[in-house]
Amino acid sequence: MSAPPIRQPIRILGIDPGLRRTGWGVIESCGNRLVFIGCGSVEPDNDLPLASRLLEIHHGLAKVLAEFVPAEAAVEQTFVNKDAGATLKLGQARGIAMLAPALVGIAVAEYAPNLIKKTVIGAGHADKAQIQMMLKILLPKAEPKTADAADALAIAITHAHHRGGALLRLKAVQA
């Protein structure tokens, strides 16, 4: 009789991209157990030109990647709003959020906002207060100081629950 497989903890970085504030959250997942590792946000100087703000986001995420050394990363997909200019700028911040982990060889999964809410809360249309309340249950040691950091933790939790399918899709696209 063979022994059951040993589950190794996997460190996951969740990123909630934004031009004013990019949230990040790091958890470890082992089976169905989640452990809070860290969270915060990168807040570039809004008075800087766009390219400099994007560079600050990249530098901030690079520091997080170096400090916490995640094995996988996940980013929230962008929704399109009425302001096309704002959507394009958010897309640029999202590009940086996907590029930073990719530059160090980390696969990046993407999740729709409704799937993140459904995974964490159980319903696809939840507000930020509901997400923060559920984070206290799922990650009792987490005390995110910003809604963006809380959202990033929710993204990491979503990846922990859906990572098998997301990684298979990533490998299929890369093949």
From Swiss-Prot:
One Pfam family linked to the record: RuvC
GO cellular component: cytoplasm; Holliday junction resolvase complex
Coiled-coil ranges per UniProt: none
Keywords annotated in UniProt: Cytoplasm, DNA damage, DNA recombination, DNA repair, DNA-binding, Endonuclease, Hydrolase, Magnesium, Metal-binding, Nuclease
Positions with a binding annotation for Mg(2+) 1: 16, 148
Domain of life: Bacteria
Enzyme class: hydrolase
Example GO BP: DNA recombination
GO molecular function, one term: magnesium ion binding
Cofactors named for this entry: Mg(2+)
Keyword Nuclease on entry: yes
Compartments, record wording: Cytoplasm
Active-site residues, as the UniProt record annotates them: 16, 76, 148
Gene3D superfamilies listed in its UniProt record: Ribonuclease H-like superfamily/Ribonuclease H (3.30.420.10)
Residues engaged in binding Mg(2+) 2: 76
InterPro entries named in the record: RNaseH-like_sf, RNaseH_sf, X-over_junc_endoDNase_Mg_BS, X-over_junc_endoDNase_RuvC
Catalytic activity: Endonucleolytic cleavage at a junction such as a reciprocal single-stranded crossover between two homologous DNA duplexes (Holliday junction)
EC number: 3.1.21.10
Cofactor info, note text: Binds 2 Mg(2+) ion per subunit.
Subunit-level organization: Homodimer which binds Holliday junction (HJ) DNA. The HJ becomes 2-fold symmetrical on binding to RuvC with unstacked arms; it has a different conformation from HJ DNA in complex with RuvA. In the full resolvosome a probable DNA-RuvA(4)-RuvB(12)-RuvC(2) complex forms which resolves the HJ.
Purpose: The RuvA-RuvB-RuvC complex processes Holliday junction (HJ) DNA during genetic recombination and DNA repair. Endonuclease that resolves HJ intermediates. Cleaves cruciform DNA by making single-stranded nicks across the HJ at symmetrical positions within the homologous arms, yielding a 5'-phosphate and a 3'-hydroxyl group; requires a central core of homology in the junction. The consensus cleavage sequence is 5'-(A/T)TT(C/G)-3'. Cleavage occurs on the 3'-side of the TT dinucleotide at the point of strand exchange.
Cross-referenced NCBIfam families: ruvC
Entry similarity comment: Belongs to the RuvC family.
Protein name: Crossover junction endodeoxyribonuclease RuvC
Species whose genome carries this gene: Rhodopseudomonas palustris (strain BisB18)
Lineage: Bacteria, Pseudomonadati, Pseudomonadota, Alphaproteobacteria, Hyphomicrobiales
